[in-house]
Amino acid sequence: MAKSKNHTNHNQNKKAHRNGIKRPQKHRYDSLKYRDAKFRRNQKFANRGTVEAIRQAKASA
């Protein structure tokens, strides 16, 4: 009895290129998910301070 085929790459390249091989989507900001918790907490307070400073600058102008 003949040995069974273990692997073939036939047609895989054609299938892959039918819709084109695309690069991963680039985003403006990377996700903060799984980022260091201490950094995220500090970022939250830093952003809050920035927003308040902008509001005060608009109010005084």
UniProtKB/Swiss-Prot annotation:
The gene is rpl29. It is found in: Cytoplasm; Nucleus, Nucleolus. One of its GO terms (molecular function) is structural constituent of ribosome. PANTHER family: 60S RIBOSOMAL PROTEIN L29. One of its GO terms (biological process) is cytoplasmic translation. Transmembrane segments: none annotated. Keywords: Cytoplasm, Nucleus, Ribonucleoprotein, Ribosomal protein. Residues 1-26 have a biased composition (Basic residues). Component of the large ribosomal subunit (LSU). Mature yeast ribosomes consist of a small (40S) and a large (60S) subunit. The 40S small subunit contains 1 molecule of ribosomal RNA (18S rRNA) and at least 33 different proteins. The large 60S subunit contains 3 rRNA molecules (25S, 5.8S and 5S rRNA) and at least 46 different proteins. It comes from Schizosaccharomyces pombe (strain 972 / ATCC 24843) (Fission yeast). One of its GO terms (cellular component) is cytosol. Its main location: cytoplasm. Residues 1-32 are annotated as: Disordered. Belongs to the eukaryotic ribosomal protein eL29 family. Component of the ribosome, a large ribonucleoprotein complex responsible for the synthesis of proteins in the cell. The small ribosomal subunit (SSU) binds messenger RNAs (mRNAs) and translates the encoded message by selecting cognate aminoacyl-transfer RNA (tRNA) molecules. The large subunit (LSU) contains the ribosomal catalytic site termed the peptidyl transferase center (PTC), which catalyzes the formation of peptide bonds, thereby polymerizing the amino acids delivered by tRNAs into a polypeptide chain. This is Large ribosomal subunit protein eL29.
